[in-house]
A protein has these predicted regions:
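A short SAM/SAH-binding and catalytic strip from SAM-dependent methyltransferases
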Residues: 126-140
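Acceptor-substrate binding/catalytic loop of class I
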Residues: 195-210
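A short acidic, Gly/Pro-enriched loop at the edge of an enzyme's catalytic core
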Residues: 115-127
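A short glycine-rich, Lys/Arg-flanked "PGG" loop and its adjoining helix->strand segment in the class I
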Residues: 142-157
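Class I SAM-dependent methyltransferase SAM/SAH-binding core
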Residues: 54, 60-116
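A C-terminal cap/extension of S-adenosyl-L-methionine-dependent methyltransferases
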Residues: 213, 223-277
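Conserved class I S-adenosyl-L-methionine
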Residues: 1-48, 62, 66, 157-188
Length: 277
């Protein structure tokens, strides 16, 4: 499959960080984050354990491996070949474990760009996930949604995250650059924060209303949308030091998610959308 030159900075960055990616996200905050993510995703798992699922922009395979462990035939795909190497290493470890070895045969690992999924069959998947803001950081969010729509079976579910436009305003305020703030508010577009110019790529941010409108325009019905993380616990690790801190924070975050306007202060938005039957 031909590579899209516009996506090379994205690929370069993720190739470079692949080997240390899991360590970057190994702390109590990310455990909190991942529990919230899974709690929202879990109700949309296919009831049929033979249903095909895809982890799009899978990175090192965190969510795809959970799906595979649940028995689903799982396709892991990412723009970065180095990220897929990390997935394959984990699958190789699974082969040595009697309780997991049989599930490895249900895994497919294949490089692909989120805006070009021609390599995969139409109307084949019951569930596609795209965590890590794949829709935000790909070169064309609308095209990505169209590609996923083509891959999903009628009634299939796409669960994904995007960066929240409203939450990013504080970054531009802190920088004190009025021109940059105005450009961002008007476009919802910024650049990946990395010092290496060769690794800088566009990031598309969305308000709740904007992402709802885009998915509907691409033929999806919005089933559920939450803001996360509404509680900015990453800013103070002391919150995790008390007994049962994780469970308390999960309960509070979940309570806040029931208030639709709370999404305005969340760093990300997570949606479950359905392809019409």
């Amino acid at each position: 499959m031909p590579r899209h030159r516009v996506n090379e900075p994205n690929r370069r960055f993720h190739d470079r960080v692949a080997a240390k990616y899991d360590k970057i996200y190994d702390d109590p905050f990310w455990e909190f984050h991942d529990r919230i993510t899974w709690n929202h995703l879990k109700p949309f798992l296919p009831r049929d354990a033979t249903a095909a699922v895809m982890d799009l922009g899978c990175g090192t395979g965190k969510w795809g491996l959970k799906l595979l462990k649940g028995g689903y035939p799982t396709t892991f795909t990412d723009l970065s070949a180095k990220m897929l190497d990390e997935v394959q290493k984990k699958l190789d470890v699974w082969k040595e474990q009697p309780d997991l070895a049989g599930k490895v045969a249900k895994a497919t690992v294949q490089e692909a760009d989120a805006v070009d999924l021609r390599a995969f069959p139409e109307s084949h998947f019951s569930l596609v996930t795209a965590m890590g803001d794949v829709v935000s950081i790909c070169s064309d969010p609308g095209r990505c949604l169209s590609e996923v729509h083509r891959l999903l079976a009628p009634g299939g579910i796409f669960v994904f995250t995007v960066d929240n436009h409203l939450a990013a305003i504080d970054h531009f305020i802190a920088a004190g650059n009025l021109e940059a703030l105005a450009a961002f508010v008007k476009s919802g577009k910024t650049e990946w924060l990395t010092k290496n110019v060769a690794e800088q790529f566009d990031v598309h941010m969305f308000t709740p209303g904007q992402i709802d409108s885009l998915v509907r325009a691409k033929g999806f019905e919005v089933v559920s949308r939450i803001g996360k993380m509404i509680i900015p616990a990453r800013q103070n690790k002391k919150l995790f030091e008390t007994e049962r801190a994780l469970e308390v924070l999960i309960d509070l975050e979940t309570r806040l998610q029931s208030e639709p306007t709370a999404a305005a202060r969340a760093s990300h938005l997570q949606l479950a959308v359905r392809k019409a039957t």
